[in-house]
Amino acid sequence: MSATEQTLDEMLHAVADPTRRRILNALKEKRACSIGKETGLCACDVEQRMHLSQPTISHHMGILKKAGLVQASKQGQWVWYRRNETALRELARNLRSAL
């Protein structure tokens, strides 16, 4: 299996779950605690939006991060998540060429 195929498989696994797709959609929007799209969404905003516990959000974010679809940065006590638009475009391009 080539590196591109392996990356595509990881990305497809990440977006196969409806909760993770909802998280990716939520990351498009600015929420209450979030200061801007450059920073992304605060983990607390993701929790509130998804109505899920912090450990569940961490689990899903870990899978999205491993696939390269989200980026995280820690600022103080908070973790801020944002979409990796380059990786999402790559996913769409690789999916088109794989099928």
Regions found by a protein language model. Give the residues of each.
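Alpha-helical residues within the helix-turn-helix
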Residues: 48, 59, 65-66
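Short, charged/polar, Gly/Pro-enriched secondary-structure boundary elements
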Residues: 87-91
